[in-house]
Amino acid sequence: MSDLTDIQEDITRHEQQLIVARQKLKDAERAVEVDPDDVNKNTLQARQQTVSALEDKLADYKRRMADAVSRKKMDTKPTDPTGIEPDDHLKERSSLRYGNVLDVNAIDIEEPSGQTADWYTIGVYVIGFTLPIILKALYMLSTRGRQTVKENKGTRIRFKDDTSFEDINGIRRPKHLYVSMPTAQSTMKAEELTPGRFRTIVCGLFPTQIQVRNIMSPVMGVIGFSFFVKDWSERIREFMEKECPFIKPEVKPGTPAQEIEMLKRNKIYFMQRQDVLDKNHVADIDKLIDYAASGDPTSPDNIDSPNAPWVFACAPDRCPPTCIYVAGMAELGAFFSILQDMRNTIMASKTVGTAEEKLKKKSSFYQSYLRRTQSMGIQLDQRIILLFMLEWGKEMVDHFHLGDDMDPELRGLAQALIDQKVKEISNQEPLKI
């Protein structure tokens, strides 16, 4: 009984501390709105962390209280001599022992799964902001994404920029862009922006602006994306003119050979793919595309558009909804995700370690991309991905950045100098450069 009393006292004490901390947080938020200097911002951040820590502790104490009550009930319950729980439906005891009781009260099954998002609501929300704050937030979540996520994990952050404001009764107030930084256990709402959803929607809406400012995710930089896109118009034009191995045109006797060759081109296969996509539209995504078309966004309407590959410059985790019905676009994103997996496999293969350690360094970008994109209502055409790989795979692998650009002869000379100097000053074994 004393344990329950102690836990209850801890809960009461932490609830009181949480009330005070939340009030201090409100005061800090008001102070930042009035005077957004570094001191006030640091105070706000510290108080947010305090509130978060108290909430976590309080939740932990409540869980401990529930466990203690459950344990007390179990202790007072008469034991069945057969070893079967009273509410178990088995007539004879299972060969397995009874394990933990999983409490599912906190789970809301009305919430969507992690693969589902309300793209129309998300798109309307993002388009409502000025372009500078959108692109700056994209930079923070792509080029500097790893650092931003690491520093803010488990919180809902707000991006602020002087270009983003709203007038309320003649008073100019900042209009913050909210992005949630979930942990592995977080449940996201359908309309909630996460870094992955933000990159997906912004890349699909503003590829031209991303191209002009050369905003790029590091994972795309290391697979040679800059090299790939520099002559995109010429590259895709040549690709479309080549013969497609998956087309066998039905031609009438006497058809000119030149016309038969025209019917075997990749361009014809892409036209057939476009016909398939035109029959598989989803209403919400159509609404988003129509809404975007009425504003400034620059979504590509064809894969040979100059800005088409820039849709994937910031490594969205799926094909953006604004170009999912453009033949070849979803497959181009899948091609990039395979290249990321290929590079990571090469990097894992060349490292020293056990087979298990090497496997941990491999990635599954392609499987994740495939699953997320197909959850939006389309099936990817694996043949198009194969065509891309046959056409550009070897060239792209040759342009991977593998973190080992030093000339072998230069490396050997540098290592010899290191070995010599280490032997002069110590009896330790020299390290490898």
UniProtKB/Swiss-Prot annotation:
Annotated region described as Homomultimerization, given as residue ranges: 1-79, 100-125, 377-425
EC number of the protein: 3.1.-.-
InterPro entries: Hanta_nucleocap (IPR002214)
Residue positions of motif YxxL: 178-181
Coiled coil: 4-71
Region Interaction with glycoprotein N: start-end pairs: 80-248
Region Interaction with host UBE2I/UBC9, residue ranges: 188-191
Annotated stretches, region: Viral panhandle binding: 1-175
GO molecular function: endonuclease activity; RNA binding
Annotated segments matching region RdRP binding: 1-50
Domain of life: Viruses
Function: Encapsidates the genome protecting it from nucleases. The encapsidated genomic RNA is termed the nucleocapsid (NC) and serves as template for transcription and replication. The nucleocapsid has a left-handed helical structure. As a trimer, specifically binds and acts as a chaperone to unwind the panhandle structure formed by the viral RNA (vRNA) termini. Involved in the transcription and replication initiation of vRNA by mediating primer annealing. Plays a role in cap snatching by sequestering capped RNAs in P bodies for use by the viral RdRp during transcription initiation.
Assembly mode: Homotrimer. Homomultimer. Homomultimerizes and binds to viral genomic RNA to form the nucleocapsid. Interacts with host MAP1LC3B; this interaction participates to the protection of Gn from virus-triggered autophagy. Interacts with host SNAP29; this interaction participates to the protection of glycoprotein N from virus-triggered autophagy. Interacts (via N-terminus) with host RPS19; this interaction probably mediates the loading of the 40S ribosomal subunit on viral capped mRNA during N-mediated translation initiation. Interacts with the viral RdRp. Interacts with host SUMO1 (via N-terminus).
Stated family: Belongs to the hantavirus nucleocapsid protein family.
Domain notes: The N-terminus is required for chaperone activity and, in trimeric form, this region likely serves in high affinity vRNA panhandle recognition. The N-terminus also contains a coiled coil region, which probably participates in but is insufficient to initiate N trimerization. The YxxL motif is indispensable for the interaction with host MAP1LC3B. The central region is involved in specific RNA-binding. Has distinct cap- and RNA-binding sites so it can bind simultaneously both the vRNA and mRNA cap.
Name this polypeptide is given: Nucleoprotein
Species of the source: Puumala virus (strain Sotkamo/V-2969/81)
Underlying gene: N
